[in-house]
Regions:
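Conserved S-adenosyl-L-methionine
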Residues: 184-195
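ATP-dependent adenylate-handling active sites, centered on carboxylate activation for C-N bond formation
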Residues: 1-182, 197-209
Length: 211
């Protein structure tokens, strides 16, 4: 997208001030692509301040859901208050299509496909619902390229044997699709994935438990 644009694309990353695990990698990619990059740092007080808001908008007390939502909620609030951006793109659904923890240990391709299909059908109840509520709470609209209907249909038609984690790398097929291109630095393309809620800082979990 950046290569087709005559203006820098805005990109954003968020992390805990105590251990922002992924900020340096996001900055590396942003520099490589030439985007206009913004880092948002949150702290323990931010979590305390926004916890009730997140629970209200998500309508749940489930700690896993709340933990996975805090960073996105705070980041969307920052974008709403500090920019004129109205539409953002997110990376949800890639796990369901190409595998992650729940499919990495599938005993065979058939089991992989069954689990992936189940999670695709339940998207509206979990990750996509969570993202939609965090985004819409701040008058933003989300776009999820991986959830494009044609792309989902195509991805689910691929032989699941090609998606199996035989190289000890989650979502290997998706990584491999970009291996012969220069869209991403090679060390970023094949680094270990961290869930969004983990990537913003493991200390966030401890802070939430304190509450």
């Amino acid at each position: 997208g950046q290569r087709l644009s005559n203006q820098p694309i805005r990109t954003f990353a968020i992390g805990m001030e105590s251990d922002p695990i992924d900020l340096k990698y996001a900055k590396q990619v942003a520099d490589y692509l030439g985007t206009e990059h913004t880092e948002v740092i949150m702290n323990k007080e931010d979590l305390y301040q926004h916890l009730k808001e997140v629970i209200y908008h998500l309508e749940t007390f489930d700690i896993t859901t709340i933990r996975a939502s805090m960073a996105m909620y705070i980041l969307c609030k920052y974008i709403h208050q500090n920019t004129d951006i109205k539409v953002i793109m997110t990376g949800e659904v890639s796990d369901e299509l190409f595998g992650y923890k729940y499919t990495d240990f599938a005993p065979n391709p058939k089991a992989f496909q069954e689990e992936a299909s189940k999670r695709i059908k339940e998207l509206y109840m979990y990750d996509v619902l969570r993202a939609d509520r965090c985004i819409s709470a701040h008058a933003l609209e989300g776009r999820v390229p991986f959830a494009d209907v044609d792309f989902v249909d195509y991805s689910m038609s691929i032989d699941p044997a090609k998606k199996m984690n035989v190289y000890n790398k989650g979502k290997y097929l998706l990584r491999h699709a970009f291996e012969e291109t220069d869209y991403l630095p090679h060390d970023i393309l094949f680094r270990e994935k961290a869930a969004f809620s983990d990537a913003v800082g493991h200390s966030m979990v401890d802070y939430l438990k304190d509450l």
